């Protein structure tokens, strides 16, 4: 049995690596890749998503371009994209699949409505999914689960309070968390438990072929962006690829129920995910939250998924 998923993302090198994992994993059936504005403008994320899908060899997977910006707030500019290889800077030398004519939110809604209940894996802002739910409220009952990389129970990674993916569109995140859909949240604090190690990069390189070389290039480029923080991990977290891996196998993570709400009004805390593990609010839990990862198993699962794409 494979789990049907839609991968909504903002590629980005980390998202591109997650696309490779989602396409190659034996337990996943990747039905669509949808992109939108996030770390890069919407046209660049769509192009990068199309490149990543072409590299997998799975040209049957539709790739759509979506949200040009957030639902309400002005679009943020990441300001941290100092990658020196892979998809940043722009790579016109790499093959790309043709983009689907539909908007990402339309493609999400149509794929969900047409088939068995799908899991939505998100590794970027939640704008496309929120728009799909606004377009077609009926699809909420047909989404099996949302597995999303975003938020934090501690410090933010963009402001003192907020993590990037949620801060890019807090109103969209609030719509998703309030839609009554089962959610697995992978906060950056929890995702930090699986890092990009020299052995992981070597393992990708050892796979060989264009896919293995591309995966290794993506991993190396991500390491160049790492800036150690006072309380953060001592290595670059793997981040986005963890989302499809946990969707396929939740036993890779330690997961606990919690109440998750998104701050929409605070002067200093706008975009913060308020994760109530102890039930202090009196509100029912609305998410399963990843608080730890088995790094060795995550690494093996990632390499196994990419190995299935190597010709």
Residue ranges of each PLM-predicted region?
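Conformational coupling and interaction surfaces
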Residues: 2, 18-22, 29-30, 167, ...
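Metal-dependent C-N hydrolase catalytic cores
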Residues: 2, 46-115, 119, 284-293, ...
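Active-site histidine-anchored catalytic micro-motif
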Residues: 2-51, 92-193, 198
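Short, charge-rich amphipathic segments
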Residues: 37-45, 66-67, 100-113, 224-246
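A residue-level signal for conserved active-site and pocket-lining positions in enzyme catalytic cores
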Residues: 63, 176, 244
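Short, surface-exposed amphipathic charged segments that create phosphate/polyanion-binding patches used
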Residues: 76-83, 160-163, 201
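Short clusters of hydrophobic/aromatic residues that line enzyme substrate/ligand-binding pockets
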Residues: 87, 164, 262
């Amino acid at each position: 049995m494979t789990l049907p998923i839609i991968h909504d993302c903002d590629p980005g090198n980390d998202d591109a690596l997650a696309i490779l994992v989602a396409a190659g994993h034996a337990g996943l059936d990747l039905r669509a890749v949808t992109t939108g504005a996030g770390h890069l403008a919407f046209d660049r994320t769509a192009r990068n998503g199309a490149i990543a899908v072409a590299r997998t060899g799975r040209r049957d997977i539709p790739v759509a371009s979506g949200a040009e910006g957030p639902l309400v707030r002005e679009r943020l500019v990441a300001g941290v994209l100092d990658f020196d290889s892979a998809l940043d800077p722009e790579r016109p030398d790499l093959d790309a699949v043709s983009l689907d004519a539909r908007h990402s939110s339309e493609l999400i809604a149509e794929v969900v409505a047409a088939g068995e209940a799908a899991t939505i894996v998100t590794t970027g802002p939640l704008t496309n999914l929120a728009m799909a739910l606004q377009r077609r409220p009926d699809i909420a009952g047909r989404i099996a689960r949302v597995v999303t990389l975003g938020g934090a129970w501690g410090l933010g990674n963009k402001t003192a309070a907020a993590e990037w993916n949620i801060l890019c569109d807090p109103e969209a995140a609030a719509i998703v968390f309030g839609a009554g859909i089962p959610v697995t949240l992978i906060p950056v604090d929890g995702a930090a438990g699986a890092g990009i190690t020299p052995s992981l990069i070597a393992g990708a390189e050892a796979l060989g072929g264009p896919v293995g070389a591309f995966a290794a290039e993506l991993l190396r480029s991500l390491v160049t962006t790492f800036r150690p923080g006072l309380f953060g991990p001592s290595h670059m977290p793997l981040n986005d690829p963890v989302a499809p891996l946990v969707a396929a196998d939740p036993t890779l993570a330690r997961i606990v129920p919690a109440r998750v709400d998104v701050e929409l009004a605070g002067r200093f805390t706008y975009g913060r995910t308020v994760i109530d593990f102890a039930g202090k609010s009196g509100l029912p839990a609305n998410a399963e939250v990843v608080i730890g990862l088995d790094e060795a198993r995550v690494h093996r699962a990632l390499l196994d998924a990419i190995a299935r794409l190597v010709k």
